[in-house]
């Protein structure tokens, strides 16, 4: 497994379906926020994001947002309506916050995936944490 390559690639987060998560035995999905789940300029969760999170939750997958964004109040305000835990100021590509999150929620590396848009932060952090890295294209517009 090369640290220079994502394990799977998708166009957008919505392409990561509950079926894929189940087939891949994913129980914890760590997601980047900016330009992965939302445009950087979006202040509130889009309906598509809320629906996708609910589908994943119904499939038994815990989603935790892990972001390098350091604005705690903004992160909490965004994550609260969709009832998703968030970790801010993650300092990716360092893997500390990823491994802490797995430990805090009692998940093993083989049950965990990091989903993000950047090789230099999200994919590398996943590789350093010894979990799978799934990459989505940089989000440019709301679907």
Which residues are covered by each model-predicted region?
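Non-catalytic pre-domain segments flanking phosphatase-related domains
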Residues: 1-31
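Substrate-recognition element of Asp-dependent hydrolases with the DxDx(T/V) motif
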Residues: 29-45, 49-76
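Structural recognition of alpha->loop->beta junctions
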Residues: 78-91
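Short, acidic/turn-prone active-site loops that include or flank metal/cofactor-
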Residues: 89-95, 137-142
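Conserved Lys-Pro-Asp/Glu-containing loop-to-beta segment of HAD-superfamily phosphomonoesterases
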Residues: 94-119
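Acidic, Mg2+-coordinating phosphoryl-transfer loop and its flanking beta/alpha structural elements
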Residues: 115-143
């Amino acid at each position: 497994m090369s640290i220079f390559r994502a394990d799977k690639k998708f166009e957008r987060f919505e392409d990561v379906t509950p079926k894929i998560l189940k087939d891949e035995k994913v129980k914890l999905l760590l997601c980047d926020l900016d330009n992965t789940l939302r445009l950087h300029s979006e202040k509130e969760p889009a309906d598509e994001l809320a629906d996708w999170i609910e589908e994943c939750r119904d499939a038994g997958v815990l989603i935790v947002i892990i972001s390098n964004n350091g604005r705690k109040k903004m992160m909490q305000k965004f994550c609260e309506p969709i009832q998703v835990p968030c970790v801010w100021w993650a300092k990716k590509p360092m893997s500390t916050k990823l491994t802490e999150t797995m430990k805090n929620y009692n998940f093993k590396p083989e049950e965990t995936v990091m989903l993000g848009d950047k090789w230099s932060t999200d994919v590398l952090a996943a590789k350093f944490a010894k979990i799978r890295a799934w990459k989505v294209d940089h989000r440019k517009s709301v679907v």
